[in-house]
């Protein structure tokens, strides 16, 4: 709803959601830079959290489906308008799942030490049982049902075809398409485009409190910690506050029930064909990765593991693995700790089916926290829209699909703020008011 008086919008979070929100606010037909003032508070740096360390996968088969088609198309539109192919690596990719059952003979005798077996047992959890691999929530049941058995593509030559028992391709063009962006490049480029239209990004500025009026019905100001000076500061007279703080959203708005889940990833230096590959790898019990064996440790996981690998432009391959629920969310993104051994596990598991990646240097080992909207222990969809407090908007809880669904989220939030409702998609199922958020 475009107001006749100066309108101040504050967004908490300089990741993909905060950046796309700022971008689409400045592109809305009602935006007037002389009366509309937009400030983005970021506790660390732009794309310093999951938005800079995610896989960047885009898929028409992603979830929630009320959001996905709009956002997938917006990615194509943004790439066409702003040269996304060059600026952030936008491209279509093949996508499928490989299934491999490995025997000791496949691993022994390899010159790579990480394939040697020393017969150690598996690490036991506290209950005495071997640890099972926990799958990332990337594919829901509907997406898994779209996989179709097919031949291993001839250009998917960075996977050892002799070990692959089954390959399932992700569906048909126009319905289950898959694309990708480089998440850090995309997020920082979108933030820069917003900044060029007048958005003010305050970095190292951690939002700590959203202040309401005396009746607790409307936003009035935002308090934040200027980490450079260690001084508390305020943005006064705000008319709208967008909480797009990823896993930290729940700390600003506890009723949102948004929390963080740590996940690790590695980046290989490898020039490989453009595929996103999901895996299901059965490992022989006696095999132990080299880094574990060298430390006299046991293998962490029992039989099956299913890491994911995405080829990227610029001679990169990105791999991610299971989430780690034991690590508490730190205060800011630059304080996230990476467990290097988990990254080494991930690289070792992928190396069992990809000699190319086994031989490739690893340029980064990293961790981030996925934002999850949780209710009674169950993961729900993201929260997008108005809350019970006038002027307070939620845009958080996107789990694995923040990069994919960021553009739609930003566009819809801009419609909420300027027009009072979402116009480009029906996202009633993501309504924060269903959960009385804001109270």
Annotate each predicted stretch with a short phrase.
Residues 17, 46, 248:
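Conserved Rossmann-like nucleotide-cofactor binding loop
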Residues 349-439:
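C-terminal catalytic lobe of FAD-dependent flavoproteins
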Residues 5-39:
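N-terminal Rossmann-like FAD-binding beta1-loop-alpha1 element of flavoenzymes
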Residues 66-70, 173-193, 335-342, 400, ...:
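Short beta-strand to alpha-helix junction loop
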């Amino acid at each position: 709803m475009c107001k006749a008086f100066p309108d101040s919008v504050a967004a908490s979070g300089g990741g993909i959601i905060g950046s796309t929100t700022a971008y689409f606010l400045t592109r809305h037909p009602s935006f007037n830079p002389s009366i509309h003032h937009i400030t983005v508070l970021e506790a660390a740096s732009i794309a310093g959290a999951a938005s800079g360390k995610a896989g960047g996968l885009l898929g028409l088969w992603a979830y929630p489906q009320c959001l996905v088609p709009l956002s997938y198309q917006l990615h194509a539109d943004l790439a066409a308008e702003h040269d996304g192919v060059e600026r952030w690596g936008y491209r279509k990719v093949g996508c499928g799942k490989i299934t491999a059952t490995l025997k000791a003979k496949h691993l022994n005798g390899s010159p790579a030490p990480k394939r040697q077996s020393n017969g150690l047992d598996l690490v036991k959890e506290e209950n005495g049982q071997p640890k099972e691999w926990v799958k990332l929530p990337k594919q829901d049941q509907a997406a898994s049902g779209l996989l179709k058995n097919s031949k291993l593509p001839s250009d998917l030559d960075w996977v050892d075809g002799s070990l692959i028992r089954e390959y399932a391709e992700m569906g048909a063009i126009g319905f289950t398409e898959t694309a990708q962006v480089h998440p850090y490049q995309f997020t920082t480029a979108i933030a820069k485009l917003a900044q060029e239209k007048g958005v003010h990004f305050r970095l190292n500025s951690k939002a700590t409190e959203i202040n309401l009026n005396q009746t607790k019905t409307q936003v009035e100001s935002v308090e934040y910690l200027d980490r450079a000076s260690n001084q508390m500061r305020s943005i006064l007279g705000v008319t709208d506050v967008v909480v797009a703080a990823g896993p930290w959203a729940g700390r600003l708005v506890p009723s949102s029930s948004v929390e963080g889940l740590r996940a690790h990833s590695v980046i290989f230096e490898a020039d490989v064909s453009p595929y996103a590959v999901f895996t299901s790898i059965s490992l022989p019990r006696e095999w132990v990765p080299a880094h574990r064996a060298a430390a006299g440790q046991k293998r962490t996981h029992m039989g099956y593991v299913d890491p994911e690998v995405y080829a990227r432009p610029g001679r990169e391959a990105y791999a991610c693995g299971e989430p780690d629920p034991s690590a508490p969310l730190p205060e800011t993104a630059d304080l996230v700790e990476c467990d290097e051994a988990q990254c080494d596990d991930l690289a070792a598991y992928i190396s069992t089916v990809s000699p190319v990646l086994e031989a490739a240097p690893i340029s980064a080992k990293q961790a981030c926290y996925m934002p999850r909207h949780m209710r009674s222990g169950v993961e729900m969809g993201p929260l997008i829209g108005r809350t019970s407090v006038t002027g307070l908007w939620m845009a958080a809880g996107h789990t694995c699909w923040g990069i994919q669904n960021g553009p739609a989220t930003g566009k819809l939030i801009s419609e909420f703020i300027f027009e009072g409702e979402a116009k480009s998609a029906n996202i009633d199922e993501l309504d924060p008011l269903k959960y009385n958020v804001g109270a």
